[in-house]
Structures are given as structure tokens and as C-alpha cells.
Amino acid sequence: MERVVVSMQDPDQGVKMRSQRLLITVIPHAVAGRDLVEWLVQKFCILEDEALHLGTLLAQHGYIYPLRESRDLTLRPDETPYRFQTPYFWTSTMWPAAELDYAIYLAKKNIQKQGALVDYEKEHYALLHKKINHAWDLVLMQAREQLRAAKQRRKGDRMVISCQEQTYWLVNKPPPGAPNILEQGPERGSYNPSHMQMSSDFYKCEIECFRKALGRNRVKSSACLEAYLKFSSQHGPHDPIMSGCLPSNPWITDDVTYWAMNAPNVAAPTKLRVERWSFSFRELLDDPVGRAHFMDFLQKEFSAENLSFWEACEELRFGGQAQVPTLVDSVYQQFLAPGAARWINIDSRTMERTLEGLRQPHRYVLDAAQLHIYMLMKKDSYPRFLKSDIYKGLLEEAVIPLETKRWPFPFLRKPLHSSPSPALQSTPREPAATSSPEGADGE
């Protein structure tokens, strides 16, 4: 996070900074929330939502803070002004948040606002007053001295220092219900069960969850082990570590024949590859060659529009954000509109839900229709494809690579020697050397 913040403040390639006027006070080196989001999008090539989430994490960790509504540590993609926190208050510096410092901070706020603290700050103030009562005169003296020194600064500097201190204590002493990033970390959510009210409704929900858990069907260990054995026996021949590679392992022999025979769009697939199509419908769709042969089968059965619709939905789901409206309109005109050339057959409820979502198109608007068509092909077309002559012919015509030299476990292979070991050489027999008169004549 610190590297990101330092890059943001780069004078050449960082975020554009400007002076921000708050009423009659001018705050220098301020940045707009919109500029922060745009910089993160361009820097890391991410979506706007992801950039907004990353910026919010930076704010929650105290690396940036808002000049307006300073208690709200979230990033807004608008003209809301923000400033970068000084490195002295960064969480990585591990500056200990001592109780004495927190008491001085609360005492300053109490003097400035004449006792108008937030509820949880009042509780902390009273608790600290009891805990360090022996040094409370020192706390008040330090608070008044810091306020006296602050009056010598410009109003803009006083506002900046006040926001910096408030952001630091919001991170180190968060309000009740807010995420404590120093304990939970950025990967956890803002859910904090310690602040939940243990009411009767809470216990009713707990009892209902336990009842559902008791009524849930449990799978026996014998059934699980049987499923594991079936899966292992089915996938064992296809595991290159356990069964080796045919014709050879390219990482050992430097022979790329294995990669060439298993290319994504090879003309003649191997037998192991064709056999994997029968494992599951997802295996068939994930293989470009298998999907092409499945499309040929569906064309013969006059239902190729189902697979075409599924492919169009996949393109919409993983395509660019700028092309979403165009792709949604194209899919609707081709597959869903009344009298469409490749109209698909889905139930009325799914059609109503899909048409309602098309009013505000997004990349997941066709998920319900895509799932319906997927299950239709999985339960109807896929079993008939495995029993068809097309699949049987592919199995018969599939390529079976010839084994050159296979090492299922390369780490068990013995090292090669340039010359045989002397211990393995047999001593020459004397009769064989002297029995031939021709040999004697030759010498």
C-alpha cells in the first residue's frame, strides 16, 4: 500500500494535485476522489469498481483522508477532496497508540468543542480519566499547550493537522461496529459479532440454523471413499505424473510432440483426450475440439442454436465492458426476440426474468437463460452425443501415440555415465584369448 501511495504522489506520473477551497480556507495539495479512481484504473488496468474498492482500503488503513466528512473513511468517485496522510501517521511505522496520547487527543477535542464528544469518545474519556487519574494534570497541561501552539499556525494548517490526527485515531481506535483493520486485516469484512445484540430474535435465528443442520442429509464415509476410488481410477490413466506422457515427457526429452498432439485446435485428437469428454459435460465444453464435434452433432439434430446461445452468453460474461450493450442487443435479436432466426426454447418464467433484466443490460443479465440451456444440453443432448455414431467414430479414429521412452517418475531414473563402472566390467577369459590360432597369427 505504501508503494501505491508513494506512486500517487509522484510529481510527473502521480495524481494531479490542486488547492481546495473550504469556505474561506484554502487547503493545498488536495486531490479529488474521481482523480484517484481514474489513476488506479490506468495504473493497474482494473475495473472502476475494483479501483474504488482499493481506494477505500487505502482510506480505511489511514493512507488518505477526506477533507469533508472526515469521519467517513471511504473513497467516493466524485469531486470530494482528499489528502495524503503524512508518513509519521502511517500504520507501518508501528507508532504505539499509547493511552496517554489518546487521552491528550480527547482532552483537546473536549476543550475545543466544550464537551461535545461522540458517545464512544465520552466513554473512552471517562475510562481514561479513571485509569490515569494520577497523571490527568499532565494530560490537561499537554492538551492546552498543543492548542496554544496550534493558534500560531495558519487556519489551513490547523485544519490539516486536525484531520491527520483524527484519521490516525479512527484507524487505531475505531468506533463500535467499524472494522478494526489492525486486528482483522483488509481481507476480512466489516462484520463484527462482538457488537451484535444478543436479543431473542438472534437466538431464534440460531435455533433455526441448528434445526436445519440436524435435518441435513449426511454422506457416509463408505460412500465418500467409494466416490474417491471411482474418481481416482477414472482419472488415473490421464494423470501425466502417475501414468506418464505419451509419446514422451517434453520437459525431460525436449521433444515437443506431446504438446503438438494436444494443441487446442488439433485436427486429430488423442484417444485419452476423447475419453475425457465422457467424464462430464464441462470437460466436453472446455475442450475446443470437443465443443466443435458437439456442435456438429447438434446441427444434425437441429438444435445447434442452444450451444450457440451458450457461447454468446460466455462471450458476454467475459467480454469487455464497453461491448456489453452491443452484445446484449445482438443476443436478444438473434435468440430471444419474437420470430428470431435462431430462437431458443426456454420456459416462460425464465423468459420474463430475462426480458425484465434487458431494460438495464449488464454482463450477467442472461445467466438464468444460460443456466436453463446448459442444463437442457447436459441432461438431453450430452447423453445422446456419447451414444451417437459420431462419438464412437471419434474413439475409433483417435490417435494413440507410440511410446518412445517413458519415465513415469523421473526422479527415480538412474543417472547416465559416460563410461561403464569398473565393477560391472567382466574380466576377459584366457581361453578365449589363446584358443584361436588366427588371433595369435594376427598379433
UniProtKB/Swiss-Prot annotation:
The keyword DNA damage does not apply. InterPro entries: DEP_dom (IPR000591), G-protein_gamma-like_dom (IPR015898), GGL_sf (IPR036284), RGS (IPR016137), RGS6/7/9/11 (IPR047016), RGS6/7/9/11_DHEX_sf (IPR047017), RGS_DHEX (IPR040759), RGS_sf (IPR036305). It comes from the Eukaryota. Residues 418-443 are annotated as: Disordered. Residues 280-395 form the RGS domain. One of its GO terms (cellular component) is dendrite. GO terms for biological process: G protein-coupled receptor signaling pathway; intracellular signal transduction; negative regulation of signal transduction; regulation of G protein-coupled receptor signaling pathway. Residues 198-259 form the G protein gamma domain. Pfam families: DEP (PF00610), G-gamma (PF00631), RGS (PF00615), RGS_DHEX (PF18148). Residues 418-437 have a biased composition (Polar residues). The keyword DNA repair does not apply. Residues 11-86 form the DEP domain. Keywords: Signal transduction inhibitor. GO terms for molecular function: GTPase activator activity. Inhibits signal transduction by increasing the GTPase activity of G protein alpha subunits thereby driving them into their inactive GDP-bound form. Heterodimer with Gbeta5. Interacts with RGS7BP, leading to regulate the subcellular location of the heterodimer formed with Gbeta5. This is Regulator of G-protein signaling 11. The lineage of its organism: Eukaryota, Metazoa, Chordata, Craniata, Vertebrata.
